[in-house]
Amino acid sequence: MAWEYETFGPDGQCKLFGVNIFDYVWQTTGKRVKVQDPIYHQDHTFEVWRVEIDGQLHSFAAGEFSNCVWGFYLEKE
């Protein structure tokens, strides 16, 4: 399994899983993964989170690429 870039957006305004992900409570999994910025190809270590949306659990990796600009990654096969 690999973590692949999904989307990015400003703090408080990013759509993931069809919703604004910042409107939900993120629960840490305690895991961290290495990812690469898709534009500048810089390596980052982002935390893996879990969120419940409409009764379904979703996992994602997220962190800041730069001040208040968040990147989101999903685990893919």
Regions found by a protein language model. Give the residues of each.
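Acidic, low-complexity, intrinsically disordered interaction modules
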Residues: 16-76
